[in-house]
Regions:
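Midchain, well-structured core segments that form catalytic/ion-binding scaffolds
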Residues: 1-154
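Redox- and metal-dependent alpha/beta enzyme cores, enriched for Fe-S-associated oxidoreductases
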Residues: 157-172
Length: 172
């Protein structure tokens, strides 16, 4: 199955994280979490650590293609409905695909998707109009030897920044 997320509004993660815009990387994990028999073939998204990801895509193998596509399409509609005001141009395509290369094991694939799904992402604390603490999953990069997730954690309070970093570290 190939999933392609594109056209989301994005923005600078330090100045626009409070706009509740969709992060395509986080949403990709939301589409794939707990899908039976999932094995990752390819996984990529975002372009800058400090930018809210506007694009992401995955090619995955699943145990039951028909059932997986049905579940993913249901989640897709949820994401698009909840983001229609903040990301009206966002698109998510889900289609059958073939892939002849290697795929990751089910366990490793599940761990990677769960990691992305649970990483802190978005506004954490705001005071009046000022963003105090936030985090952003900016880049998801599959180099075939490793999958890298780049996240940026910001805070005006050091202990809050270290807290967000500790949460992320414990997930990974």
């Amino acid at each position: 199955i190939k999933l392609d997320l594109r056209g989301f509004e994005g923005g600078h993660s330090g100045m626009e994280i409070d706009k509740a815009r969709i992060n395509a990387i986080n949403s990709l994990a939301r589409l794939l979490v707990d899908i039976d028999g999932l094995q990752i073939a390819e996984l990529n998204g975002g372009v800058k650590r400090n930018a809210i990801a506007t694009t992401a895509y995955a090619i995955v193998s699943v145990a039951d293609r028909k059932s997986a596509i049905k579940e993913i399409n249901s989640r897709k509609e949820d994401i698009l409905n909840e983001s229609k005001d903040t990301d009206p141009k966002g698109e998510i395509s889900v289609e059958e695909a073939s892939f002849d290369g290697k795929v990751l094991s089910e366990d490793l694939s599940k761990n990677i998707i769960n990691c992305i799904y649970t990483l802190p992402n978005g506004l954490y604390k705001k005071y009046k109009d000022e963003i105090i603490t936030s985090s952003n999953i900016g880049i998801l990069e599959d180099s075939k030897d490793e999958i890298r997730i780049s996240s940026m954690i910001r805070s005006q309070i050091d202990s809050a920044k270290y807290n967000r970093a500790a949460i992320a570290t414990n997930i990974v």
